[in-house]
Amino acid sequence: MHSRTPPRNRLAKVLPDEWRKLLVARGAPKRKYTAVCRVTLVGGRLIEELIVEEGWIIALDRAGLAGTFEQRIDFDPRTITDVVILQVV
């Protein structure tokens, strides 16, 4: 389940449960974490730096992450086929 507090990006999308479970299995805390992942989507699109915060996809790169911001997440999270965790904070 994603966090009850709203994400810093009001346009954020919820990360599917199977990928949240993978993050926890690979060492991310269940709550209060930020993870940087490399994600492959259906069709072969590669996102180098997907930022996940407490179960929410909040950004597609590290640019402009300070404070509250708006960045459009331009894909359906259900189309994720592979996740590689680069960093967990």
Predicted regions, residues:
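Motif-centric detector for short Cys/His coordination patterns
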Residues: 1-89
